């Protein structure tokens, strides 16, 4: 499972002209399920994401997590993160989880996130979304948890 997280001053998702999710300062997270991912990978990725120290403390060091700062988390489904770009000029999405599996894992991830953190907003799985954000830094990290084979 993949999470591309960006520290933001604010972020929002619009679907069909309506804002479906928005946060102030926090993390905007593009989330992707890969083939073979299960709730185990989702749990591990969520634990890492919520405790990942990307916010500055009083000394200016990245020592605080989104939980420590009570920041928002905007979770946006993004299957293209699993693209295989090694060959040619058209990406292959074979590494991405099947849509029904990906939807179930995204919904599970959101449910678990809401049980562990107060400020969770989401995009809409399968929708054409317009995502807006103001990067803070910019600070961007790629987190990935692979199934143990």
Curated annotation (Swiss-Prot):
One of its GO terms (biological process) is D-amino acid catabolic process. The keyword RNA-binding applies. Keywords: Cytoplasm, Hydrolase, RNA-binding, tRNA-binding. A motif (Gly-cisPro motif, important for rejection of L-amino acids) lies at residues 137-138. SUPFAM superfamilies: DTD-like. It is found in: Cytoplasm. It is an enzyme of class 3 (hydrolase). It catalyses: glycyl-tRNA(Ala) + H2O = tRNA(Ala) + glycine + H(+); a D-aminoacyl-tRNA + H2O = a tRNA + a D-alpha-amino acid + H(+). InterPro entries: Daa-tRNA_deacyls_DTD, DTD-like_sf. The keyword DNA damage does not apply. It comes from the Bacteria. GO terms for molecular function: D-tyrosyl-tRNA(Tyr) deacylase activity; Gly-tRNA(Ala) deacylase activity; Ser(Gly)-tRNA(Ala) hydrolase activity; tRNA binding. It holds the Pfam family Tyr_Deacylase. Its EC number is 3.1.1.96. Disulfide bonds: none annotated. Its main location: cytoplasm. One of its GO terms (cellular component) is cytoplasm. Homodimer. A Gly-cisPro motif from one monomer fits into the active site of the other monomer to allow specific chiral rejection of L-amino acids. An aminoacyl-tRNA editing enzyme that deacylates mischarged D-aminoacyl-tRNAs. Also deacylates mischarged glycyl-tRNA(Ala), protecting cells against glycine mischarging by AlaRS. Acts via tRNA-based rather than protein-based catalysis; rejects L-amino acids rather than detecting D-amino acids in the active site. By recycling D-aminoacyl-tRNA to D-amino acids and free tRNA molecules, this enzyme counteracts the toxicity associated with the formation of D-aminoacyl-tRNA entities in vivo and helps enforce protein L-homochirality. This is D-aminoacyl-tRNA deacylase.
């Amino acid at each position: 499972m993949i999470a591309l997280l960006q520290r933001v001053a604010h972020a929002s998702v619009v679907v069909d002209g309506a804002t479906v999710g928005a946060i102030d300062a926090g993390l905007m997270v593009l989330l992707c399920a890969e083939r073979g991912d299960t709730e185990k990978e989702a749990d591990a990725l969520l634990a890492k994401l919520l405790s990942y120290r990307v916010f500055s403390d009083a000394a200016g060091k990245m020592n605080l997590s989104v939980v420590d700062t009570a920041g928002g988390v905007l979770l946006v489904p993004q299957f293209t993160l699993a693209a295989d770009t090694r060959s040619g000029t058209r990406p292959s999405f074979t590494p991405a989880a099947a849509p029904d599996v990906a939807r179930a894992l995204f919904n599970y991830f959101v449910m678990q996130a809401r049980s562990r953190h107060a400020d969770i907003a989401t995009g809409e799985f399968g929708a054409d979304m317009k995502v807006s954000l103001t990067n803070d830094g910019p600070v961007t990290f790629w987190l990935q948890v692979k199934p143990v084979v």
